[in-house]
């Protein structure tokens, strides 16, 4: 195993730690506490995923949050003026690359959902194995609340994880489903007490890291072919429609 790479300390919202066997744990945070998703997070994540992918010392990725939640807060203003084409263009670029790079990451991904996730729950549910806390709840707060359509990959991941009709129901009603419900539907593999979630995810990751690396890499590619293809087909239109609905906000009565 090589020394700690420079990119481990490059990004302010991601704490990275790698075991000797090659299990990389990515923890979302803001100043050491639960993360507030910002324009910086959105900009940095596709870059980080690219660096993770090209670092061949990374054998398995574990994704988790900080404290008692996975991700529930977002600073919409920090994403820029999405009502203008050039303002939304960078969000379009980043928004397509994040889910595609997760889908194409050549290693197993395990999510340790340590609590509620109402912002970018697709980051948790796209994982090959989802381990959730008994306190975890899933929903999509930002899109309809902010007046934009959900086209950044959430629509694809939810359809794959929940089923098409159920995904549409929860996206349009902004309803919340529990970890237990998600397990019943097949979206979550295991539901555990909060203090056991990360340890269990890392245990599974260590088991995978002990296998031949080409095996786990190519297994990940094989098992994610469908969702990778759907991301390539669906996020271009999805993000374009997000941009159109964002632009429309400037013309709504409350904006005048």
Where are these regions (language model features)?
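C-terminal alpha-helix plus adjacent terminal tail
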Residues: 1-24, 30, 56, 67-71, ...
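A short, well-ordered alpha-helical element
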Residues: 14, 37-61
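Terminal peptide-recognition signature
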Residues: 26, 45, 63, 124, ...
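Glycine- (often His-adjacent) and acidic-residue-rich active-site loop
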Residues: 57, 64-97
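Glycine-rich beta-to-alpha active-site loop
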Residues: 96-145
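Gly/Pro- and small hydrophobic-enriched strand-loop and loop-to-helix capping segments
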Residues: 128-151, 188-200
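Well-ordered beta-strand positions
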Residues: 128-129, 169, 173-175, 181, ...
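Hydrophobic, secondary-structure "cap" segments at the distal end of domains
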Residues: 155-165
